Every structure is written in C-alpha cells, then in structure tokens.
Amino acid sequence: MKIQKGLFFLQRSIKNVLRKIIKFIKGYVKDIIKEINVKSLKKYKYNLFFEFIGSFLFVFFISIYMLNSNSNEEYIIKHTKQINPYKTNDILIPGHNNFEAEINNIKYMNNLNQERKNVVASILLEKYDNEYKGNNKSKREVERDDDKISNNLQNEFEKDNEKKKNYDNINEKEISTTSDGKIKDMEDPKNISNKNENYDNTNMELKNEKINNKVNDEKNIKNEDDINNKENMLKSVDKIIFKEPVNEYSKIKIEDINNINLKDIDQYEVLKNSENKKSSNHAIYSFVGCFIYVIFILLGAHINPAYTYALWLTEPKKYGFALSTLYITFQYFGGIVASIICAHLYGSIFIYTLLPKKEIIKTFLCEFISTFLITLLLLSLYNYKKKFMEENKNDESLTFNINKLRNMSSLYNFNTYEDFYSYDMFSTNQNRKYNSFLYIDNKYIKYIMNHIFYLLFIFFSLLFFVFVTNTTLNPMFSTSTLYTYLYYKIFKASNSFKIYSIFISFLSITKIFQLLIFYIQSLPLWIGPYFGSAFAATFLSLFKENEEEIINIIDTNVYSSYNKKKEQIPLIDKNSAKQNAYLIEYNDNIHNNSYNYLLPSVF
C-alpha cells in the first residue's frame, strides 16, 4: 500500500510539473506571437544591417589577430594513449597528409587516403631495412678491425719467437767457448722468459684498449647520428610526424593540426611552445577590431549575442524574444561568413586554437569575468543614454515654451521654478543667450563627454581582454569556428556539391557524436559569456529604482462612464486626451523638476 501511494504521489507530481511547463510554454508562445503582430520589424532593418556588418568586421579582424599571434608559436603534439611507440611501430598523425619532401632518406607518397596500410608498411620496412643494413655494416667493420689487430699481434709474436731462438743459439755458442767466470756474468734464461711474458701481457692490454676505444667511438658516432637525424626530422617535417620515444614530443607546424581528424583529437595533447615566439605587428588587427566594435556600439549595434540577451533580461518589453533572436541571427550570420573567408585566406587554424584542452575551468572563469565587466559597462552606458533621452525628449533647453509659462504662473513663483542646473528659467536675462547663432547647453556637453569616457573605457577594456588574456568575450567566435569546421569537412571535402548529400551526412550517428564532442569541449567558450552577461544584468537590476509613481485614481471626468473600476496608471508621462487641466500642469511640473521627485539611478 505504501509503495502504491508513493507511486501515485510521484505520478501526480510529475503531471503537475508537466502541466506548468506546458502552460508556461504556451504563454510564452502567445507573447511571441503578440510581439510579432504588434511590432513592425521593418523599422529595425537598419539595425539588423549594422549587426551583420559589425559582426562580420569584428570577427574577421579578431580572427586574423588570433591566427597571426598563434602562428608564431610552435605547437607540440603528444600521443597520450601509447606507452612505447617503438614497440608497436611508428604512428602517423591521421588526416590528409600531402607532402613532397624526404625525411631520413625515406620517400613518401602524396596521397595516403588510398592504400594507407600498404604505404605505412612499406615505410616501416624500408626504415627497418636501413637500420638493419647499418647495423650489419658496423658489425662487419668491427670484425675486420679485430682480425687485423689479431693478425698483427700474431706476426709480432712469431717474430719475437724467432728472435728468442736466435738468441738462445748465440748463448749456447758463447757458453761452449767462454770460461766459467764469463758464464756467471751472462744472463739467466729464466729472466728472458719473464721478459717475454711481460711483453705478451702488454700486447694483450694494448689490444683490449684498442678494441674498447673502437667500440666507444662507434657508439658515440651512432648517438651523434641519431641526434642529428632527430633534429633533421623535427626541422624538415611539414605534414607528417614519426613519434619520438617516451617523454619526448614531436614538434610540428601549426598548419598540421588541421590534418588531425576530430574523432582522434582526444588521443593527442596539444601544447604551446612560446620559446620560439617571434615579434610581429599583428597587434594592429586587435586594435582595429576593438575600434570597429566601439564604433558600431555608438551606432546602436550590439555585435554580441550575450549582450543582446542581457538587454532582453533588462527590458523584456522593449527587446522581446522574437526581436532578440532576430538580432542574434544576423550577428551569427555575419560572424560565420567572416570566419569562412578568414579560413580561406589563412587556413582553419582557429578550430584548434580556440578549442580548450584540460583548462576548462580557467577558460570558463576568464570568459565569465571578462564578459561580466564588458556587459556591465555596456548596460551602464545604455541606462545613461536612456535616462538622458527621457529627461530631454522635449528639447526645452534650446526652445522655451511661452504657453507653459502662462499655465504654470498661477501655481508657482518665478524664483522657485528652476531647472536642473539651478538657474531661473523665467528670468528675462537668461533668455538673451538663446538669441545667439549657436548655443549648446551645458548638459549636452556633459553628455558628450560622458559618452566619450564610456566608449574609451569600453575600448581599452576590450583591447586588454583580447590582447593580454586572449579571450574571445563573445560566443559568436565558437559558433563561427564550429560552422567553419563543418564547411571544411563537408562543403570543401568533395569536388561535387550536392545539397541532399549534406543532409544525409548529418544522419550519421558518428558525425553527430563528433559534433557533440566538439561542442562539449568548446562549451566554456559558449557558456562563459552568457553566464557573465546574465550575471551583469542581474547585478544592475539590484540597483534599479522605480521611475514611475503609481497611484490610485478615483473615477472622475478623466474616465468614461462605463469604466467603474479603480485602475492603477502611471502618473508621470501619461499622455491622454481625456486628462483634466490639473493633471496636465502636475505632469509638466514633475517633468521639469524631476530632481525634486525622483532619485537619480546609480548607473
């Protein structure tokens, strides 16, 4: 019974959750339909055009900067799933390997896609044959030297024996002819035999020393040859790499990383070697990209999907879901076109330069913090512009309204009715300055200076994050990278372009799995900016103040007779044709003396 009750409660709770989710989705879809029906999207055509052009130029120049900055660094590839490469034959980096050079006197073919196994086997057999021939030659040379040394020693030993026999004969003759006293003075034959034995020992020691020196010299020569061969192999490699021994890396050029298949990328560890980094003037590309970003921000473009969604969270009524999605679509479209063109010019290197390996947390934190700060600055600038435009939408600082003076003279004194800068609006002396040919109020000068300060601060912050920390600050880069990879593998791989073959290729489970792996590996570059922008929008909402005063209105001549309910309407800036004179004067008073009624926002 308890189990049945528990299952019934679980089933009922799941149904309630599903109903709430379906209800929320239906309401959201209705809101989107209302937004599309109410808003005329044609008036946003110039905004969408600026989004496309700005995203295209920004991604293009920043991609060129990243490509040039990374091309001056040597990349190191390590095979992580192989213990001893020499025991299981040398491994070739997978991919399309096209080259015309010779490495260690080994000839290679240009196309390895067909008969790959036969080509690799022939390469390895040729290499092992050369090693075997070299070892046999060295052994034969050592044996020849040993034979020569032994023959020389044997000849010398025979000559010594002949000398010894001759010497013995001479001694016998001398013994027969000389006296007994002279025999004592002659040398003992035992001493002669001892001398011969010492001579033989010295000859054997010299022989062993010569052999040892010969072997050591040959070992040193072999080691030097191996080192020279490794150095030549590292320097002359263009498209293909033989793996080095354990704990050693194979250096390759950055273009070779593009030849690694996506399914085999987990088998390799891509590292950077900044020791060989050379000076270059590629920093100008980052400067131009950041300058373009600031210029299009000044024109009203966003050029960042994360910032667009932050505006949607800040003002969901103005930037609805449909409009925000349309903005982001044009941003992605411009970025993808720029990345494909950049890949045609410089190669698809950034597919792997932007792919994080074993530093996911570090990449996520860099993207999160940098995007949070940039979005905070952009939202602060947006709120400042919005507040200034609302306060000065009637442009009364340049043109004085005489009718308003007559309407407000019955309620307020001239001395108390002052503007934001605390000078009398009704003073006749102040009106003389409007008679000049060109007059700009101080608040407009202040607005322009603050605007320039915001833009410069955004420019240098963006330049710092891109140039120093090498962060993208934009999920559009990762999307452009993914679609550029698809372009290279699908569109450019085959000579004949067929649309139906592309759709069929996406039905492959292995390709879908590869794309999911690529997406997960580059996930910090996607989630970090979105999290940073959302956190910035939430942070600013904590300091947001209510700019509208809501009061209850009793049914008067403002409303028609059929409206019998009490309603809450905003009193400020409520332009209605049925308002009475008191409400008009009250609204005008609050509009021109907003500092007495409203607190200024923090940002």
Swiss-Prot record:
It is a multi-pass membrane protein. Its main location: membrane. Keywords: Membrane, Transmembrane, Transmembrane helix. One of its GO terms (molecular function) is water channel activity. The chain crosses the membrane at residues 40-70, 282-299, 321-346, 360-393, 442-471, 509-542. It catalyses: H2O(in) = H2O(out); glycerol(in) = glycerol(out). It comes from the Eukaryota. Residues 191-200 have a biased composition (Polar residues). Pfam families: MIP. Disruption phenotype: Dramatic reduction in development of mature sporozoites in the mosquito vector with no impact on any of the preceding stages. GO terms for cellular component: endomembrane system; plasma membrane. Residues 135-200 are annotated as: Disordered. It is found in: Endomembrane system. GO terms for biological process: development of symbiont in host. Residues 135-149, 156-190 have a biased composition (Basic and acidic residues). Disulfide bonds: none annotated. Required for sporozoite development in the mosquito vector. Aquaporins contain two tandem repeats each containing three membrane-spanning domains and a pore-forming loop. One of the two canonical Asn-Pro-Ala (NPA) motifs in the pore region, which are highly conserved in aquaporin water channels, is changed to Asn-Pro-Met (NPM). Belongs to the MIP/aquaporin (TC 1.A.8) family. This is Aquaporin-2. It comes from Plasmodium falciparum (isolate NF54). The lineage of its organism: Eukaryota, Sar, Alveolata, Apicomplexa, Aconoidasida. The gene is AQP2.
